[in-house]
UniProtKB/Swiss-Prot annotation:
The keyword Membrane does not apply. It catalyses: 3-phosphoshikimate + phosphoenolpyruvate = 5-O-(1-carboxyvinyl)-3-phosphoshikimate + phosphate. SUPFAM superfamilies: EPT/RTPC-like. Monomer. The gene is aroA. It comes from Listeria monocytogenes serotype 4a (strain HCC23). This is 3-phosphoshikimate 1-carboxyvinyltransferase.
Amino acid sequence: MKLITNKQGLVGAITVPGDKSMSHRSIMFGAIAEGKTVIRHFLRADDCLGTIKAFKALGVKIEETEEEIIVHGTGFDGLKQADGPLDIGNSGTTIRLMMGILAGRDFDTVILGDESIAKRPMNRVMLPLQQMGAKMHGKDGSEFAPITINGKQSLKRMEYHMPVASAQVKSAIIFAALQAEGETIIHEKEKTRDHTEHMIRQFGGEIEMDGLTIRVKGGQTFTGQEMTVPGDVSSAAFFIVAGLITPGSEIELTHVGLNPTRTGIFDVVEQMGGSLVVKDSSRSTGKLAGTVVVKTSDLKGTEIGGDIIPRLIDEIPVIALLATQAEGTTIIKDAAELKVKETNRIDAVATELNKMGADITPTEDGLIIRGKTPLHAANVTSYGDHRIGMMLQIAALLVEEGDVELERAEAVSVSYPTFFEDIRSLLK
């Protein structure tokens, strides 16, 4: 696909699609709740539609209208064995959280996905669930999908110190803990996104959060809710960076989710001297949302690492692009988790942006980016990774001559089906 290039500025306002993490979880909680859940501004992208498909296969009635998704909850006990394997496509969130949800059911399940999912590590989820009494294994006894879950197991409480900072692993354990006997205690290594914890309360459940320690009791029931999903800050990040680095730009992003566990990119933009203002913030069904305004800015390099990394892990590819347009060196460290995303994002970012003229060195746990560098035309690939694909489109906006051809552009639809349309809507 030929990307949009050499446009002098992006100006206007857009509303980015609903938050991907919250869209997944809204379906999951709607399914395990009693009664009806109505979801507005749901992200109708491949990953989240895969979650809907999975729960329909488990016997949950889900209606899709133009404005709403309506989930007729069955409770945990109302879930039924699927007729065949659950195919979750490219969604790591779906497979890992479903492992927790299905660990305590009274039927067997096989969960599989695409080629990317088959390469992603699952022991980080399987091992703690097995400690709770779950029986599950990967292909040929490995940790890789397809994952077979043997039902009819009694789950027991546990106290678990998480070896990695992962909201997906934490959430899988929480879903299993809701079906276990007694109180499960989870100690996080670093604070990660907390949408699951907040949704437990939103759907009428109880959970204790004290710093890095979470306590959740088994045997809880939930009640269906009405909710509006705020815009995804990870999707907004591409337009934040576009507005900062494209000459003559001013972009307004409305109804963006402002959960503090997700807004690390705001802190980085401030460190680098970028113009980013949040206004009109309000609570939307228990979640903070607001309008983010960015303008073209002169930027300086910075160092990014430590406990901010879980707050911006998905934004690192586009933050790396931002750093190519900053004066001086930017160092990103403590981000080895990027190696086990849809692709090895450390290598992918360095390889593809260097093709375009960037000066980036990959490290074991991050990137060293030397700026400021002009970017030029090249043939690039997304590696089938939606965030790499979108980052490369933002990079292409800086190319003054020639074409930027993107292989596997279709990956963008995983999280942002209208991404290219929204770019065009902001062109001067």
